[in-house]
Every structure is written in structure tokens, then in C-alpha cells.
């Protein structure tokens, strides 16, 4: 029986630190940095979604801590960044302002979107980024939500976004 699974990893950064600590206890230590060998288990877990048979699906959502001031956190994030299919970057200022979801739209996105989206969809996404790019992060989400409320689906949004962009240029 085929099953689709979603795995939530609250902190891939913390899990990687645990693997690093275990490696240190085995005598493999890199002072102030993460031993790349110790990250192989985290990469293997994070990359498991690509290794399924029989058309099953495993989707992994993992949180990574960035911009904490810790060289170890930054090192882990850089090392694991290439494993992800997409990045959703949260914005602290937007969260503090009560904007939800507090997503930084300009830093978030799907890697290699051209493989799964049509040219029209990619052009629409680019246009949305151009329109919202001049706004502060805390203003982007309310503006996008306002646009979404005026449309019934993604296709409608992409059609109307061209008209809105033309109006904004006038």
C-alpha cells in the first residue's frame, strides 16, 4: 500500500549540532566549526525525499536557524542549503508587527522553479516580485493578501497582475 508522508523537523540546525557533538565524542573535532562528516546524517535525512520507490511521497519541512550570530549555525545552514528544494524565509520585523504569515517574499522561493512552472507563471512571479520589491517587508504580505482576496485562483491572479502592474506604472 502506497503512503504519502510529511515529516516535520523542528530544528535541522539543532539536529546537526547533536550529530556534531556525537562526532566530537568519537574524537573528530573541528574547533568553532562543524565537522562536514558529522553533517552527512542530517543531509541523508533531509535528502530522503529523493530516494523513494513506487511513486510514494515524502515531504520534509525542516527549520534552520540563521542569522543567530553563531558561526556554527551559519556553517550548518550554508552546508545544508544546497539540499533544499525551496526556501521559506521568515521576517522577524513582520512577525513583530503582527503580520502573518511573516514571510520575506523576496528571499523565499522554489529552486529551479522553471522545471515545475510554466513561462506565464514564472513571468507572473517575476512581476509580483517587481511590484512588491519596492515595499518594506512588513508591507509586502498585506499587499499580496489584498491582491489574492481580489482573485479566485492563481490563474486569475496572474491575469490581473499584469493589469495592476500597468496601473502602477501610470
PLM regions with names:
Residues 1-170:
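P-loop NTPase catalytic core
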Amino acid at each position: 500500500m502506497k503512503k504519502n508522508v510529511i515529516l516535520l523537523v523542528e530544528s535541522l540546525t539543532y539536529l546537526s549540532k547533536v550529530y556534531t557533538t556525537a562526532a566530537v565524542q568519537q574524537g573528530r573535532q573541528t574547533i568553532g566549526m562543524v565537522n562536514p562528516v558529522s553533517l552527512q546524517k542530517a543531509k541523508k535525512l533531509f535528502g530522503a525525499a529523493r530516494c523513494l520507490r513506487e511513486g510514494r511521497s515524502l515531504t520534509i519541512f525542516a527549520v534552520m536557524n540563521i542569522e543567530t550570530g553563531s558561526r556554527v549555525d551559519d556553517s550548518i545552514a550554508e552546508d545544508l542549503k544546497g539540499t533544499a528544494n525551496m526556501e521559506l524565509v521568515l521576517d522577524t520585523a513582520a512577525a513583530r508587527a503582527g503580520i502573518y504569515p511573516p514571510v520575506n517574499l523576496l528571499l523565499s522561493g522554489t529552486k529551479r522553479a522553471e522545471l515545475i512552472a510554466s513561462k506565464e507563471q514564472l513571468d507572473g512571479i517575476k512581476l509580483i516580485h517587481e511590484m512588491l520589491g519596492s515595499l518594506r517587508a512588513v508591507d509586502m504580505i498585506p499587499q499580496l493578501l489584498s491582491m489574492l482576496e481580489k482573485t479566485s485562483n492563481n490563474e486569475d491572479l496572474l491575469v490581473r497582475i499584469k493589469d495592476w502592474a500597468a496601473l502602477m506604472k501610470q
